[in-house]
Amino acid sequence: MAFLMKKKKFKFQTTFTLEELTAVPFVNGVLFCKVRLLDGGDFVSLSSREEVQENCVRWRKRFTFVCKMSANPATGLLDPCIFRVSVRKELKGGKAYSKLGFTDLNLAEFAGSGSTVRCCLLEGYDTKNTRQDNSILKVTIGMFLLSGDPCFKTPPSTAKSISIPGQDSSLQLTCKGGGTSSGGSSSTNSLTGSRPPKTRPTILGSGLPEEPDQSLSSPEEVFHSGHSRNSSYASQQSKLSGYSTEHSRSSSLSDLTHRRNTSTSSSASGGLSMAVEGPEGMEREHRPSEKPPRPPEKPPRPPRPLHLSDRSFRRKKDSVESHPTWVDDTRIDADDIVEKIMQSQDFTDGSNTEDSNLRLFVSRDGSTTLSGIQLGNRVSSGVYEPVVIESH
């Protein structure tokens, strides 16, 4: 029975990509990395030498190698396989280097998981001046099984989940996928342990919630009871456009909504009873007739609601016009001033007392003057002489 205790052997094709090193506390410098397998092989390699730019170094270097692992035959748990990445800095023009830090990765955690991205903090070789506690190394690891039993177990991951500030854990979805049938919803509720969703009351065209009919016990009875229009076209459009509920109520008052009245007397007599609700809440019952009733016509499409900015501007304008401010009370009205000036003026015809035309007078010394009938006495005394200008 000794062969049963022999460990299982595995071979994995490993693809290791050295992405970048961030939060480097150097403004300039040349960094490179040395990667090697501590367990499961003798792979050793060096990355390219890159300069520090904006406290970050990007290599984008890809390494491919074969990694050997073993597992416990009883549990199938893979044994640790350590892969070390050492970050180093060039000194003396590349002739020497200094070790900045390293990180150890257990490749057994990534076995058979495809491509995985991991960010690691660098660990310092000593505690003096070469520790880079805040530098973060980003790598990508992909492992594919080449040989061995495909049934194995990976050790628990050592990665730490970082919670984002301001994100509520209750916002995460508890279940994926959702069926529309009642069976799917009941199974989902039983798995998640949540209460079944409550049935919301139907909103009528008048904006009032309609209570569910107690006389209809099964979905077949609800389906065969007839046509029922719960909401008007305007209310449906307002829900799609995000319009307010108050406007949908007021706009749907003009539409008449028909609802099947399933009373005990009508179901017993076998007749068809229709209840019509108007804006005032009045109901009129139509007596059963021999001819089957025609389906109600589709109401005309209501006008398209205004844009939100137009509505707010109109509401603001109406409020300003209806409510005068203290500036309007203290300001002098220009129309009142113009009206007072017009009333104080005399616009009667005064041509009977004054001469409508002006005349030019020249005196003996050469002085001139313009006047009407006021200079008549001076003209008669010979002080001024009238001048007559004739057109040539």
From Swiss-Prot:
Q: Where is the composition biased (Polar residues)?
A: 228-255
Q: Where is the composition biased (Basic and acidic residues)?
A: 281-300, 307-324
> Which stretches does UniProt call biased (Low complexity)?
183-194, 262-273
Query: What's in the keyword line of the UniProt record?
Result: Cytoplasm, Membrane, Nucleus
Q: Where is this region: Required for interaction with TNFRSF11A/RANK?
A: 129-138
- Could you list the residue ranges forming a coiled coil in this record? none
A Pfam family assignment:
NT-C2
What Gene Ontology cellular-component terms does the record carry? cytoplasm; membrane raft; nucleus
- What positions does the domain C2 NT-type occupy? 2-145
Q: What InterPro entries does the entry give?
A: EEIG1/2-like, NT-C2
Subcellular localization is given as:
Nucleus; Cytoplasm; Membrane raft
What upregulates it?
A: Induced by NFATC1 in bone marrow-derived macrophages. Induced by TNFSF11/RANKL and TNF in bone marrow macrophages.
GO biological process: one example: positive regulation of osteoclast differentiation
Please tell me in which tissues this protein is expressed: Expressed during TNFSF11/RANKL-induced differentiation of bone marrow-derived macrophages to osteoclasts.
Question: Where do the record's region annotations for Disordered lie?
Answer: 173-324
Asked if the keyword Transmembrane helix belongs to this entry, the reply reads no
Deleted gene: phenotype? No effect on bone mass under homeostatic conditions, however reduces osteoclast number, amount of bone destruction, number of osteolytic cavities and abundance of serum Acp5/TRAP levels in a lipopolysaccharide-induced bone destruction model.
Q: Which domain of life is it from?
A: Eukaryota
The task this protein performs is described as: Key component of TNFSF11/RANKL- and TNF-induced osteoclastogenesis pathways, thereby mediates bone resorption in pathological bone loss conditions. Required for TNFSF11/RANKL-induced osteoclastogenesis via its interaction with TNFRSF11A/RANK, thereby facilitates the downsteam transcription of NFATC1 and activation of PLCG2. Facilitates recruitment of the transcriptional repressor PRDM1/BLIMP1 to the promoter of the anti-osteoclastogenesis gene IRF8, thereby resulting in transcription of osteoclast differentiation factors. May play a role in estrogen action.
Identify its protein family.
Belongs to the EEIG family.
Subunit field text: Part of a complex composed of EEIG1, TNFRSF11A/RANK, PLCG2, GAB2, TEC and BTK; complex formation increases in the presence of TNFSF11/RANKL. Interacts with PRDM1/BLIMP1; following TNFSF11/RANKL stimulation in bone marrow-derived macrophages, the interaction promotes the binding of PRDM1/BLIMP1 to the gene promoter of IRF8. Interacts (via N-terminus) with TNFRSF11A/RANK (via cytoplasmic domain); when in the presence of TNFSF11/RANKL.
Q: What is this protein called?
A: Early estrogen-induced gene 1 protein
**Gene name for this UniProt entry:** Eeig1
